[in-house]
Amino acid sequence: MISSSANVPRSGFYYFSQGWKLVSQPGIRRFVILPLLVNILLMGGAFWWLFTQLDTWIPALMSYVPEWLQWLSYILWPLAVISVLLIFGYFFSTLANWIAAPFNGLLAEQLEARLTGATPPDTGIFGIMKDLPRIMKREWQKLAWYLPRAIVLLILYFIPGVGQTVAPVLWFLFSAWMLAIQYCDYPFDNHKVPFKEMRMALRTRKVTNMQFGALTSLFTMIPVLNLFIMPVAVCGATAMWVDCYRDKHALWK
């Protein structure tokens, strides 16, 4: 059994840093390989293509800046770049999580077992196949919750002035919360905790989850490091589950 943090709740920054340590633990590494490969292939290809398009996209986005804000262009330009990286990174992170969802759930389950010494249900390829419909239904629930809110925020980008100042900040906060939901959901879902109940549980420690999601969002924008972020975030979120939520919500002890 690995000791995570003596079951004392810590900050979201702590759990994110724990993810980097836990991902390389003996016995856990083999469950990291498939999520890691999915993320490397998808995020690596996506960000390579993105950087070939930035010279076209950023001027197009800046064209929405009204003349009376042109004097702020030296501030708005980096905000525009960050906005594109945030939106693009979150979109492809979501896609990668869809593809790797069954393996992320297995990684969270095996790590939880090692952190707690508890015995998980029988797993393996047949267990994953049996749970696949439930896992994909859960991913649809997350998408249905996320999409309407994301569309509203994206519309803000096309409002002159607002789109280049307020919208990037709102999108960062939203993506931080959504990434906390995305990764914390794997251990919650392993214990069949309903999606709405999971969101309510996360709100009881909103600052911790926003810290965790904000760091995950930032690292998703950083080339090379973003290739490893999926399994790291799953491990960090699982450590948070063990310390903060498991006692109340665990299905298996």
UniProtKB/Swiss-Prot annotation:
Domain of life of the organism encoding this protein: Bacteria
Subcellular localization, as worded in the UniProt entry: Cell inner membrane
Keyword terms, alphabetized: Amino-acid biosynthesis, Cell inner membrane, Cell membrane, Cysteine biosynthesis, Membrane, Sulfate transport, Transmembrane, Transmembrane helix, Transport
UniProt topology in membrane: Multi-pass membrane protein
Any one Gene Ontology BP term: cysteine biosynthetic process
GO terms under cellular component: plasma membrane
Pfam families assigned: EI24
Residue spans crossing the bilayer: 31-51, 72-92, 151-171, 222-242
InterPro entries associated with the record: CysZ_sulfate_transptr (IPR050480), Sulfate_CysZ (IPR022985)
General function of this protein: High affinity, high specificity proton-dependent sulfate transporter, which mediates sulfate uptake. Provides the sulfur source for the cysteine synthesis pathway.
Family that this chain belongs to: Belongs to the CysZ family.
Name of the protein: Sulfate transporter CysZ
Species the sequence originates in: Escherichia fergusonii (strain ATCC 35469 / DSM 13698 / CCUG 18766 / IAM 14443 / JCM 21226 / LMG 7866 / NBRC 102419 / NCTC 12128 / CDC 0568-73)
Gene: cysZ
